[in-house]
Amino acid sequence: VHKKRMTQPMKMTAYEKHDWAEIDLDALRNNFRAVKARAGEMPLCAVVKADSYGHGAVECAKVFAEEGAAWLAVSCLAEARQLRKAGLTLPILILGHVEPSRAPVLIQEDITAACYSLPQARALSEAACAVGGKVKVHLKADTGMGRIGFALRTDFDAALAEMLDACRLPGLDVPGL
């Protein structure tokens, strides 16, 4: 039996040139199938940020798409665009910050941004309206780490009100939280 493997050179210092990462794409496929079987009908988002943690985002994303992932997630717009350029059509969620000025690209390439605050939501909405479109966003709630997101943990009522305000903005389409 021939196993399909993908070897990805890693960016290393001169002292670490002997290291590499090798991914068995069949094992990745089988692992995803196992998770999907446990999840039942729950849609799964495959996180392929940071080049799938150095293992080849495009190759890994193609496996996840073939196996029925509902979404792909990346850390930045450049990673999302790389997946689109490779022909991946699944919804893509950017987990990191996206500048509102990039709204036209998000709209054109059907890429979803994470939205962390009402000011960010307003800025994205304004930028989208300026080009006659809507940006898809998932609202990010801070549920405990205290780092980023609508502050549900510290002021639930105020954060919920802000999230609802974001959902009503004319330049946003909010398919998720």
Where are the regions a protein language model picked out?
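Active-site-proximal beta-alpha core segment in soluble small-molecule metabolic enzymes
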Residues: 14-15, 19-22, 27-29, 40-176
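Short, Lys/Arg-enriched N-terminal segments with co-localized hydrophobic residues
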Residues: 1-9
